[in-house]
């Protein structure tokens, strides 16, 4: 057993000295102190991860927990391996932290297998690039931003535009409609939201199909910089068992931010905007592990907080390079009360291509975007001169655009308790049929309010009837 001692503690950085063999970089070290209840000194169980070798038999480590109570001279044991976490079915329905310990007060996790969190991405020859659409049941995604099975989708948005609610709805739809396993990584987000998500999943019955991995805002940077890797390790196990897994990362920006904090603590020279010099390397190491192999697939959805709504921020730009599609959430659309507040003109997907989604889907999607684009161009004229000054064709375009805009909204299952409107899952063929009918002018006579917060197009007619509107045949 390789034993050393603590020689220096600066915040969450701990330097340790070993007389014999030095622990390797990324090895986990353990500090176990019994404490003294009589003196009010609590027990101490802390895991450290070796970050660098300093020379003179010293290593610099990052703490995976609070360093309160650490003193020089404490005994440190080298585990001889990286942090390992439990994987497999026993993890489903549970909340674990960065080192794989349960934090849901439901007893220990009886897992047979434990995997290290630092492993290489699958070899190029093991990967299986697929271009198949993944149905989400959310109209705006399925039509305009089709998800790739085994791909990576990024969700960009400032604070309070609905990123977390969309992720919760996606987990609900995957569990209820696809029977798939999901892994949720809470990276540096609010503990209250993590708790709400857990209770919501318990309430809606999807919890047995989800593994929750939390390293929230109150945790030290070492935890937030590693929690995504822990979640990915859990997901990789299910993929290698032949399953299609969904991993949700909320929020990938906090992963970068934690890396920046750790980098500063380790004394590295910062690069652009104060980020770590290894920004793209760290992002690449994480993203390359999210992939499809011959055995199974990992599809990921990553919420990306955009600081000050600036899409050119280096952290945001580093994520962009890895994505198959981008869902841009817009504050202007949220202000109109249209949720999910997805910007239909800014959001993109690699597979919105007739060779993948088919001609009809492609034509309808592009048709919707062109009508909305024309409406956007006409808004200045409407604001200055009024809608009456437009030509008859443009008036019709504006009326259809407003209906399309409202039809892109949808009631969510996970928001039922707040809105009182039952959630809707809309099949892809129903989505295409509905938007095609609006573009073809079949619903030009119905009021735009009837298109707001409904599921398939049939519900528009029902809603119009309830509003006392009779169709002109």
UniProtKB/Swiss-Prot annotation:
The enzyme's first-digit EC class, named in words, is translocase
Kindly give the InterPro entries that the UniProt entry links to this protein: AAA+_ATPase, ATP-synt_VA_C, ATP_synth_F1_bsu, ATPase_a/bsu_AS, ATPase_alpha/beta_chains, ATPase_F1/V1/A1_a/bsu_N, ATPase_F1/V1/A1_a/bsu_N_sf, ATPase_F1/V1/A1_a/bsu_nucl-bd
- Give the record's keywords alphabetically: ATP synthesis, ATP-binding, Cell inner membrane, Cell membrane, CF(1), Hydrogen ion transport, Ion transport, Membrane, Nucleotide-binding, Translocase, Transport
**GO cellular-component term (any):** proton-transporting ATP synthase complex
Q: Identify the residues that bind ATP.
A: 157-164
**Keyword Hydrolase among record annotations:** no
Q: Which reaction does it catalyse?
A: ATP + H2O + 4 H(+)(in) = ADP + phosphate + 5 H(+)(out)
Q: What is its EC number?
A: 7.1.2.2
Regarding the membrane, this protein is recorded as: Peripheral membrane protein
Report the subcellular localization.
Cell inner membrane
* Highest taxon in the source lineage: Bacteria
Spell out the molecular function terms from Gene Ontology.
ATP binding; ATP hydrolysis activity; proton-transporting ATP synthase activity, rotational mechanism
Q: Please give the function described in this protein's UniProt entry.
A: Produces ATP from ADP in the presence of a proton gradient across the membrane. The catalytic sites are hosted primarily by the beta subunits.
List the HAMAP family. Answer: ATP_synth_beta_bact
Q: How does this polypeptide assemble, per the annotation?
A: F-type ATPases have 2 components, CF(1) - the catalytic core - and CF(0) - the membrane proton channel. CF(1) has five subunits: alpha(3), beta(3), gamma(1), delta(1), epsilon(1). CF(0) has three main subunits: a(1), b(2) and c(9-12). The alpha and beta chains form an alternating ring which encloses part of the gamma chain. CF(1) is attached to CF(0) by a central stalk formed by the gamma and epsilon chains, while a peripheral stalk is formed by the delta and b chains.
> Family, per the entry?
Belongs to the ATPase alpha/beta chains family.
Q: What is this protein called?
A: ATP synthase subunit beta
Q: Name the species this protein comes from.
A: Thermodesulfovibrio yellowstonii (strain ATCC 51303 / DSM 11347 / YP87)
